[in-house]
Design a protein with these regions (language model features):
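N-terminus-biased detector of the onset of the functional/mature region
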Residues: 150-151
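Catalytic glutamate of the conserved HExxH
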Residues: 128, 132-136
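Active-site rim/adjacent substrate-binding subdomains
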Residues: 2-124, 136, 140-145
Length: 151
C-alpha cells in the first residue's frame, strides 16, 4: 500500500499547530470547505477534468493514523493532501479491477496552513488539488517543483 501513496507534505506547519484550539482561516465549517473545494474543481478546465476519468476527490479533516504511519509523518498538520492510486503512466489494461483513484484534501491542515501563511484558503486548496492531480498524471514531487519554479 505504501508504494501506491504519493504525498504532499508541506513541511511548513510547526508542531505548535497540533492544538485544535488554534484560529483557522475561512471557511470555518466543513460544508463551506467542501463548497470551496467544489468551486476550485469546477474552475479547472473541462478537458482537464474529463481526463481525470473516475478520480474521486474526498475532503476529510485529517489523514488517518494508518496513512500517517505509512508515510512516516508524525504531525498530522504536515499532510495537506494525498493522491492514492496508480498514476496513469503505471496503469495497464491488463491490471485487475481496482477501486477508483482518490485525492484526499485534508481540511484542517489546509485551513491551518492558509492561516499560518496568510493565504486565501481557496488558493491553498487549488495548489494542493493541482499537485495531487499531477501525481495522477505521473509527475513526482520533484517534477512539479520544477514546473512551478519555471512558471
Amino acid at each position: 500500500m505504501a508504494e501506491d501513496l504519493e504525498i504532499r507534505d508541506s513541511g511548513k506547519i510547526a508542531a505548535a499547530f497540533a492544538s485544535a484550539s488554534m484560529p483557522l482561516a475561512e471557511p470555518r465549517t466543513a460544508q463551506d470547505f467542501e463548497t470551496a473545494a467544489q468551486a476550485v474543481w469546477d474552475s479547472l478546465p473541462e478537458q482537464f477534468r474529463n481526463a481525470l476519468g473516475n478520480v474521486m476527490v474526498q475532503v476529510v479533516d485529517f489523514a488517518d493514523a494508518e496513512t500517517l504511519d505509512a508515510l512516516r509523518i508524525y504531525n498530522p498538520y504536515n499532510l495537506l493532501g494525498l493522491y492514492h492510486g496508480a498514476g496513469l503512466p503505471f496503469k495497464s489494461v491488463w491490471d485487475p479491477a481496482r477501486l477508483p483513484d482518490r485525492i484526499f484534501l485534508y481540511r484542517i491542515p489546509i485551513l491551518s496552513y492558509a492561516d499560518l501563511n496568510g493565504e486565501r484558503t481557496d488558493r491553498v486548496i487549488r495548489h494542493v488539488l493541482i499537485h495531487e492531480i499531477g501525481h495522477h498524471f505521473g509527475f513526482s514531487d520533484a517534477d512539479m517543483e520544477l514546473i512551478e519554479a519555471s512558471a
